[in-house]
């Protein structure tokens, strides 16, 4: 079910998730972990129009958990933390039906 996802940035994870295809509509797991649910402060959905790019975002103290149940999205990550072992590392991670999972 998908592509290999190699991540170079320390602290970033790709957690493979399951999806169940059904002719009536597919089912996508997002999480079964109690600690994931307990720590949620905000949940929102976003769309990206085909061929468009959404702006770079810089988060200093935020952990995001991203899932792409419809379509395919390429996330480009850069480690700008000067005190990080992976300082200046860059990752391109593609998430979608062929590589379904949660990016943390």
Q: What are these model-predicted stretches?
A:
Residues 100-104:
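Short, intrinsically disordered, charge-balanced linker/junction segments flanking boundaries
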Residues 1-99:
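Non-catalytic, conserved peripheral segments adjacent to functional cores
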